[in-house]
């Protein structure tokens, strides 16, 4: 076996193990020792391929976001936000470890993350905003409402939702429960943005 191929297989094994541990216990709860002991990987092998725990975590987050974007790009999102939310939820159900990695930065304070993680988070946010704007472009907006207004409103409500749920992240609620709350709330927010909350008079 070529050395380069062996190295790639080794890194993939380490990443798979790290995704499981970070995806289960979070950055703070997971340790390199856990990864080594549970998955029968030597610590020397990990530090030969990754500088430290931070770099390993960044690679896991990058993989989670890359896989999410790749999955979502298989579908065409037009004016149906429910279809978009269905596919988001489907991905998170299929890949619970990726789900936890992604939501660990959605529902946490940006200040705790390295610049590299912030860049990955921004890539995730930009991708989702682009889908939102693609849907908006196929709708007839109310008079006086611009694309920029729609985007600003969406961003504001999204940030408020994340801030609100990040407080629950510090409570005794399970992380899976928080993810479920986030996705259900986001679906409602998108519905409110598009169709409002008041029934028009006949």
Language-model region placement:
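Hydrophobic alpha-helical connector segments
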Residues: 59, 73-98, 147-154
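Amphipathic alpha-helical segments used for helix-helix packing
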Residues: 93-115, 163-171
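Amphipathic, non-transmembrane alpha-helical scaffold segments
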Residues: 15, 57, 61, 103, ...
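Short, basic, alpha-helical segments at the C-terminal edge of helix-turn-helix-like DNA-binding modules
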Residues: 62-68
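Helix-turn-helix
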Residues: 9, 13, 17, 21-55, ...
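C-terminal peripheral helix-coil segments that are non-catalytic and often amphipathic
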Residues: 90, 129-134, 156, 163-202
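Amphipathic alpha-helical packing segments from all-alpha helical-bundle domains
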Residues: 69, 112-140, 148-152, 162-163, ...
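N-terminal intrinsically disordered/low-complexity leader segments
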Residues: 1-9, 201-202
